[in-house]
A protein has these predicted regions:
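Active-site histidine-anchored catalytic micro-motif
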Residues: 94
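Conserved "HGTGT" condensation-loop signature of ketosynthase/thiolase-family condensing enzymes
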Residues: 1-87, 101-105, 112-140
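Short helix-initiation/N-cap motifs at beta->coil->alpha
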Residues: 89-91
Length: 140
């Protein structure tokens, strides 16, 4: 029988500069815009340039067809470490855990973990249409 695995602690990793952009029920802006706004607030709060961010974790359901890699170019980032986590409410926790491990491994020094979506007039219906086969079966 194998010995139980002992998880490594998160010592030496710091989570700082939490940012929250005020909620708007409906918006004509894209999720990309909201994520960019959050990233700007994060960089300002940390007192750094966005160019110093060398890790980027993004969570969103409404940036399609773009993913985190496309957004890095749009936002002027050049990360050494990149993650796209489209898993809904648990994405924030996953982003922080993965980012912490990336810092511990030396893959990045400063990781921005951002999430953003938008709710335009038809967003909910379009999201359900393409969310999953299970959602399609339940809705149609």
């Amino acid at each position: 029988m194998a010995a139980p695995m002992v998880r490594k602690s998160y010592s030496g990793v710091v989570a700082t500069v939490p940012v929250s952009i005020p909620y708007e029920r409906y918006s004509i802006e894209s999720a990309h815009w909201w994520i960019g706004r959050a990233l700007r607030a994060l960089a300002q709060g940390a007192g750094i340039s966005h160019r110093e961010i060398d890790g980027f974790a993004m969570a969103s359901f409404s940036t399609a067809p773009d993913s985190a890699i496309g957004l890095t170019q749009h936002l002027g980032l050049s990360p050494r470490w990149l993650d796209h986590i489209p898993m809904g409410g648990v994405s924030g926790i996953l982003s922080l855990r993965r980012a912490a491990r990336a810092v511990q491994a030396g893959d990045a020094d400063i990781v921005a973990c951002v999430a953003g979506d938008t709710n335009q007039v038809d967003t909910f219906r379009r999201t359900l249409e393409n969310f999953s086969r299970f959602a399609q079966d339940a809705a149609y």
